[in-house]
């Protein structure tokens, strides 16, 4: 009861301190760092890092107040130092809560304005609570524990600074150790973020247990009766529940860290190919397979049943290997209705573990199994690819159903029937030429979709999508994008941009290798950091269609032209990949993409418009580049700190790719005889026979096709 009476007094004293309000004010404005700093390119992340450091400093400042004023003996005579510690901690936490609430209120209208029509209040609240809100108590606990161990101001500040610096530097790529700045590389605007938010929450709560345990241990070391830390520990620990509580918190932290369900234990050596080079079984073939998949979109888990029709002509028992996504459990494995032994390896590679099943010597074997669980990811720094919610999901290969590793296909390949049951608002999109159809509707608000495919694995997307059917370039294009992004897409003229790009590029360069059929799917994915393609489908990254990207003047004169730019990458960048010529070369997919965008815009809006918004802009930026101080005096660039040097180098490199290279291609166009000649050259490069060992388009290949040298393309 005494503690309850002391708490409002301590909180009132804290809120009457000018230092407290200065820290609160700085915390409220700290998210602005995220608008200008690429390292923490999110206001909530920046606010958490900066606010955490600020409240760590405030904690040491407040705990040292009595010692700094030389009244510690008097205050300890009035209030036990143990009681004072139990009152000061919640008072500091309450001040941190006040700072968080004020920050969220101040940044709510700012975030609404910056994000626009796709602003999601739920994501906003969760992002600030997890990225910023939980950083403040962690910092307070860490700083308070350091002070209670040392009972002086200077050493705790050094320890806390080192602890924060470790999180921001050495531990930055370790999602479980970066306690101050969660390892969050991007949040989706159009789809859900449950997976990455759960991961951040898990990390924060794990650290909360650990730092609470350290604080409880430091609480035992608070100086009493003139004793040192060990003597005080022995005295305070007489009440057994105190050390037991500290030990329990630390043990729970260790267990939580070891039992994390998000990241697998795949071999970090990306050149490892143990599973890929597995010898196929002689005399065993897969005639057909099927899977019935039922994701739980609320829990983010998957449950399914897989069946494989195998032909075993060896007359002997065989061991079939299948790839299983880590996080899944396997059960009820049967061959022709009889349970058979199986095992799952501890070794993992490329987000797969090996399931081995013994099948009988019978010629026709129906292998069935049940699988399910929370699918784990293999890339801790880019979590979110296995998002599974009522708004979006992506199940790839073994995450969709266990993948045969050492069984060859039959005469008809790997014919497969996949069924998946999802909420009615979700549209199922097989990544490929297959088309899904609804085969059943259920009373619980779900539908069952079915599609046929012919692969050992496969990728399936599903979400709250809008589908537009577009006729262009002799193809029927099914353009899928998130419903939340519909207004942005319509304002940017997405359908018209798709039509213009496909008509132009297919007519001038040739059809896409992965669009050789009558239909092509263009699918907007959740933010992934890039795209890829297979026969009949191509992926478009959500990041290409954000309001910020569509307003990038370096890619076009308006949102519609930036949309054209991003779609041209289906030809230059995805249909034809480019080599990395190094930091000193402007050669990349962006050069030909900008040039092609210019040509399309020239056809649509005329030469004067294209010259003003593209060529003149490129020339102006190139002139500024050659006048840049660090370009003229590179020795000064080398003298800068690494972070500053990289920021400047990346900026200059981007200018060369987006402006200098298009001008070089434009000059090459003049030297080879005009637009028609350049179109013929690019058509030949696009349709050249690829070297499977190095399928990249190089700058030298471009120069050779034009009959030019690098010196010929030197800009005046």
Predicted regions and their residues:
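Juxtacatalytic substrate-recognition/specificity segment
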Residues: 348-350, 418, 471-581, 585, ...
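Extended, low-hydrophobicity, Ser/Thr/Pro/Gly-biased non-transmembrane segments
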Residues: 370-462
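N-terminal, polar/Ser/Thr-rich
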Residues: 177-203, 230-301
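A surface-exposed beta-strand-loop module
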Residues: 317-319, 327-387, 440-448
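Zinc-dependent metallopeptidase catalytic helix centered on the HExxH motif
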Residues: 410-412, 548-627
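Amphipathic alpha-helical substructures
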Residues: 504, 644-716
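Acidic/His/Gly-enriched intrinsically disordered linker/tail segments
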Residues: 590-663, 671, 692
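Long, hydrophobic alpha-helical segments
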Residues: 43-71, 99, 306, 369
């Amino acid at each position: 009861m005494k503690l309850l009476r002391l708490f409002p007094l301590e909180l009132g004293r804290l809120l009457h301190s000018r230092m407290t309000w200065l820290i609160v004010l700085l915390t409220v404005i700290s998210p602005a760092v995220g608008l200008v700093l690429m390292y923490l390119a999110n206001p909530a992340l920046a606010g958490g890092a900066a606010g955490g450091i600020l409240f760590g400093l405030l904690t040491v400042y407040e705990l040292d107040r009595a010692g700094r004023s030389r009244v510690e003996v008097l205050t300890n005579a009035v209030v036990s130092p143990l009681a004072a510690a139990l009152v000061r901690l919640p008072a500091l936490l309450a001040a941190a809560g006040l700072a968080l609430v004020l920050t969220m209120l101040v940044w709510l209208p700012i975030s609404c304005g910056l994000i626009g029509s796709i602003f999601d209040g739920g994501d906003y609240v969760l992002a600030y609570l997890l990225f910023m809100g939980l950083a403040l108590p962690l910092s307070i606990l860490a700083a308070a524990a350091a002070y209670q161990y040392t009972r002086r101001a200077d050493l705790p500040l050094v320890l806390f600074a080192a602890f924060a610096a470790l999180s921001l530097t050495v531990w930055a790529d370790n999602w479980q150790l970066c306690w101050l700045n969660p390892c969050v590389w991007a949040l989706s605007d159009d789809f859900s973020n449950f997976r990455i938010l759960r991961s951040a929450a898990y990390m924060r709560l794990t650290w909360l247990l650990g730092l609470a345990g350290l604080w409880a241990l430091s609480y035992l070391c608070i100086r009493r009766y003139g004793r040192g830390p060990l003597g005080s520990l022995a005295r305070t620990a007489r009440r057994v529940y105190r050390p037991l509580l500290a030990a329990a918190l630390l043990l729970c932290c260790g267990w939580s860290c070891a039992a994390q369900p998000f990241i697998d234990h795949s071999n970090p050596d990306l050149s490892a190919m143990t599973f890929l080079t597995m010898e196929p079984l002689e005399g065993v073939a897969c005639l057909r397979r099927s899977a019935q998949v039922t994701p739980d979109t609320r829990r983010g888990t998957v449950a399914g049943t897989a069946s494989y029709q195998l032909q075993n002509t060896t007359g002997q028992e065989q061991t079939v290997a299948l790839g299983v996504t880590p996080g899944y459990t396997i059960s009820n494995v049967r061959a022709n209705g009889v349970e058979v032994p199986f095992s799952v390896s501890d070794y993992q590679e490329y987000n797969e573990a090996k399931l081995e099943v013994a099948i009988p010597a019978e010629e026709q074997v129906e292998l069935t199994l049940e699988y399910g669980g929370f699918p784990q990811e293999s890339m801790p720094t880019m979590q979110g690819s296995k998002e599974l919610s009522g708004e979006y999901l992506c199940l790839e290969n073994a995450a969709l159903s266990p993948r045969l590793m050492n069984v060859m296909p039959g005469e008809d390949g790997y014919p497969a029937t996949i069924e998946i049951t999802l909420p009615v608002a979700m549209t199922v999109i097989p990544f490929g030429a297959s088309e899904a159809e609804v085969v059943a509707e259920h009373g619980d608000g779900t539908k069952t979709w079915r599609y046929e495919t012919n692969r050992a694995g496969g990728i399936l997307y599903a979400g709250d999508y809008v589908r537009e059917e577009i006729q262009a370039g002799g193809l029927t294009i099914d353009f899928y994008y998130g419903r939340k992004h519909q207004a942005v897409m319509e304002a940017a003229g997405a359908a018209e941009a798709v039509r213009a790009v496909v008509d132009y590029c297919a007519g001038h360069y040739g059809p896409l290798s992965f669009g050789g059929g009558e239909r092509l799917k263009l699918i907007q994915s959740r933010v992934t950091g890039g795209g890829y393609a297979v026969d009949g489908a191509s992926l478009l990254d959500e990041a290409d269609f954000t309001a910020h990207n569509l307003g990038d003047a370096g890619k076009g004169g308006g949102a519609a032209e930036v949309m054209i730019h991003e779609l041209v990458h289906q030809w230059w960048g995805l249909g034809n990949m480019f080599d990395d010529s190094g930091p000193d070369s402007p050669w990349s997919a962006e050069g030909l993409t900008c040039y092609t965008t210019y040509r399309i815009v020239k056809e649509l809006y005329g030469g004067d418009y294209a010259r003003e918004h593209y060529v003149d802009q490129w020339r102006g930026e190139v002139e500024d580049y050659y006048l840049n101080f660090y370009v003229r005096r590179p020795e000064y660039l080398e003298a800068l700190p690494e972070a500053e040097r990289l920021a400047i180098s990346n900026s200059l490199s981007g200018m060369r790719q987006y402006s200098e290279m298009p001008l070089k291609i434009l000059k090459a166009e003049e030297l080879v005889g005009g637009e028609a000649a350049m179109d013929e050259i690019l058509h030949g490069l696009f349709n050249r026979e690829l070297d499977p060992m190095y399928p990249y388009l190089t700058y030298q290949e471009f120069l050779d096709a034009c009959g030019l040298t690098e010196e010929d393309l030197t800009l005046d």
